[in-house]
């Protein structure tokens, strides 16, 4: 399989330099970048007036939660979870998760996400959906034991079942992570088991961390230390840990995270919508912490549009700190691409020869994206997910001219509507 994308503005390399060039993709890698390439290809895409960008990496989400979109808004996190989300989740069966994951991944493809990190339950169904639709995903089962030994055994069994299932797929696009939910829902015994198993298998870990004031207070009261201090004492924190949120971190905790080379995933829309707080982005970046970007689940966002997430991240920190230079367009663009790839040890998030061909084409032939001048600025501050025209994952075209080629979009929309009408 080969693809030639011609006549586009290319966001090139780690520095995000804009060049006018063609891109030749062979198998699943970017093979050649240059002007007026004459190579023959199975697919030729004319990108005149368009921008060729690395695909976005959504480093924290819960894809099947699109089923809960609009279920409950404008309330606190704990009320939202206890009174709305958890009661509906108890009704969700495997078939619901499968169709929810198809809708979530469909939305991601149509808004330019090529890789995502997911945590939920019945994750074998998510893996099936991902394999079918053609995205790249890192999937985890959200483990919660609340200190109960019997529950812990069940969670361990579910996690190992998912690991075995994903390995049986032998897919280059579907990978397993360990997913202990959070320090306040997982016992030290479970967290220690995860750490040991991650070391043994070489698999990565994703976890929620210090999303709200309340959970930090709970940990302090129970253990006499902060969440990061607790995890560090357990030997949990290493460079294979991807921690979502990191809103309520002390300076000491930031220092520990930097020392352990942990990635923090910023979820500005969710943090703002649930009134959770504002992460200390400036301090994290100054300390050298790798900060990636995520949407969180659609129930608390309420979409999976990484372009919108970049804009929110950029604007939030400017107004919160009264510093217009903070979270500039290039910084948040890298959070949505290169930093996510770094967290996942993935040869993607950048357009250069030899990188994985996870590439999107953004249509700039639109009033809100003209004149074509500062392209990164336009993507962050002016564009939206609907401007993504073509999505390529692992060297395969999964969306061309806004048409998703791998599945029947209308069928997914109809099926999910029927499911949700019955569930609610």
UniProtKB/Swiss-Prot annotation:
Keyword Hydrolase: yes
Substrates-to-products reaction catalysed: S-adenosyl-L-homocysteine + H2O + H(+) = S-inosyl-L-homocysteine + NH4(+); S-methyl-5'-thioadenosine + H2O + H(+) = S-methyl-5'-thioinosine + NH4(+)
Cofactor annotation: Zn(2+)
Keyword annotations of the record: Hydrolase, Metal-binding, Zinc
EC number per UniProt: 3.5.4.28, 3.5.4.31
Cofactor note: Binds 1 zinc ion per subunit.
Name the UniProt record assigns to this protein: 5-methylthioadenosine/S-adenosylhomocysteine deaminase
UniProt gene name: mtaD
């Amino acid at each position: 399989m080969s693809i030639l994308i011609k006549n586009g503005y290319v966001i090139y390399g780690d520095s995000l330099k804009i060049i006018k060039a063609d891109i030749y993709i062979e198998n699943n890698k970017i093979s050649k970048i240059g002007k007026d390439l004459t190579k023959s290809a199975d697919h030729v895409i004319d990108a005149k007036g368009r921008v060729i960008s690395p695909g976005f990496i959504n480093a924290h989400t819960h894809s099947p939660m699109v089923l809960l979109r609009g279920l409950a808004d404008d309330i606190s996190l704990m009320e939202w979870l206890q009174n709305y989300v958890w009661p509906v989740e108890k009704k969700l069966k495997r078939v619901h998760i499968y169709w929810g994951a198809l809708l979530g991944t469909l939305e991601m493809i149509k808004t330019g996400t090529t890789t995502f990190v997911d945590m939920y339950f019945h994750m074998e169904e998510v893996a099936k959906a991902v394999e079918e639709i053609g995205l790249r995903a890192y999937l985890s089962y959200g483990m919660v034991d609340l200190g109960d030994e019997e529950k812990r055994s069940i969670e361990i069994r579910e996690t190992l079942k998912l690991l075995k299932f994903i390995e049986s797929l032998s897919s280059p696009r579907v990978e397993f992570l360990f997913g202990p939910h959070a320090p306040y829902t997982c016992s030290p015994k479970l967290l220690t088991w995860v750490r040991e198993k991650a070391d043994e298998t070489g698999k990565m870990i994703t976890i929620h961390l210090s999303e709200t004031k309340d959970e930090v207070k709970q940990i302090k009261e129970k253990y006499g230390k902060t969440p990061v201090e607790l995890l560090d004492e357990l030997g949990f924190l290493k460079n294979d840990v991807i921690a979502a949120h990191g809103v309520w971190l002390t300076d000491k905790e930031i220092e520990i995270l930097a020392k352990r080379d942990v990635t923090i995933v910023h979820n500005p829309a969710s943090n703002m919508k649930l009134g959770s707080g504002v992460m200390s982005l400036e301090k994290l970046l100054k300390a050298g912490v790798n900060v990636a970007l995520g949407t969180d689940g659609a129930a608390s966002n309420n979409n999976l549009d990484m372009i919108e997430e970049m804009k929110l991240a950029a604007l939030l920190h400017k107004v919160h700190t009264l510093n217009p230079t903070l979270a500039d367009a290039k910084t948040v663009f890298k959070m949505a691409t290169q930093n996510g790839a770094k967290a996942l040890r993935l040869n993607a998030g950048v357009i250069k020869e030899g990188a994985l061909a996870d590439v999107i084409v953004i249509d700039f032939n639109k009033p809100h994206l003209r004149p074509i001048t500062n392209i990164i600025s336009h993507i962050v501050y002016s564009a939206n997910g609907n401007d993504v025209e073509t999505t390529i994952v692992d060297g395969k075209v999964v969306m061309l001219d806004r048409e998703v080629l791998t599945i029947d979009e209308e069928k997914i929309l109809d099926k999910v509507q029927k499911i949700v009408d019955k569930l609610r």
